[in-house]
């Protein structure tokens, strides 16, 4: 049987202790947001950490791998580099390798991508009439990764009840934990 001792702990708290715990929770959330914003500034990427959601980049990256990105304007995009990009009309960014670069005489660069595990290039994924990606489409470039750590994110997206259970337990831990 599940022990509900934590409810007794919450009931025993006076208003000041409960207020302190809620304030603690707010500080944790604020700190996490500040760290995220700081990473955005340092890396130059709107999303400095992403999770690989499909097997299209195997064997380089597997579903659930956590990627660390940078997006420095001064760094040129190179063939073979792994980029994370957004396509207009799609919410989720895509992680694929640069296959070809098309450079115009004015210095404007366009490029074509492909997943390592895919048979064809990504032109079928781009919006209709678009044959190349531009630098403005890039969210970041992979600079490092941690294998399978992001599987928790995938589980939370695939199973919303799991997500709410984890968030509830984390919130409860912060409220009940004294220190």
From Swiss-Prot:
DNA-binding recorded as keyword: no
TM spans (from-to): 17-36
SUPFAM superfamilies the UniProt entry points to: LexA/Signal peptidase (SSF51306)
Membership in a protein family: Belongs to the peptidase S26B family.
Disulfide pairings: none
Principal localisation: endoplasmic reticulum
Cytoplasmic side: 1-16
Enzyme superclass (EC): hydrolase
Name of the protein in its database record: Signal peptidase complex catalytic subunit SEC11A
Region feature C-terminal short (CTS) helix, mapped onto this chain: 165-176
GO BP term, example: signal peptide processing
Any one Pfam family match given in the protein's UniProt record, by short name: Peptidase_S24
The reaction(s) this protein catalyses: Cleavage of hydrophobic, N-terminal signal or leader sequences from secreted and periplasmic proteins
Membrane topology according to the record: Single-pass type II membrane protein
Substitution effect: residue 121 to N: No effect on catalytic activity or protein stability
Domain notes: The C-terminal short (CTS) helix is essential for catalytic activity. It may be accommodated as a transmembrane helix in the thinned membrane environment of the complex, similarly to the signal peptide in the complex substrates.
Localization: Endoplasmic reticulum membrane
Record's function text: Catalytic component of the signal peptidase complex (SPC) which catalyzes the cleavage of N-terminal signal sequences from nascent proteins as they are translocated into the lumen of the endoplasmic reticulum. Specifically cleaves N-terminal signal peptides that contain a hydrophobic alpha-helix (h-region) shorter than 18-20 amino acids.
Entry EC no(s): 3.4.21.89
Species of origin: Homo sapiens (Human)
Keyword Endoplasmic reticulum carried by entry: yes
Highest taxon, organism lineage: Eukaryota
Self-association and partners: Component of the signal peptidase complex paralog A (SPC-A) composed of a catalytic subunit SEC11A and three accessory subunits SPCS1, SPCS2 and SPCS3. Within the complex, interacts with SPCS2 and SPCS3. The complex induces a local thinning of the ER membrane which is used to measure the length of the signal peptide (SP) h-region of protein substrates. This ensures the selectivity of the complex towards h-regions shorter than 18-20 amino acids.
Keyword field: Endoplasmic reticulum, Hydrolase, Membrane, Protease, Signal-anchor, Transmembrane, Transmembrane helix
One MF term in the entry's GO annotations: peptidase activity
GO cellular component, one term: endoplasmic reticulum membrane
Active site residues per record: 56, 96, 122
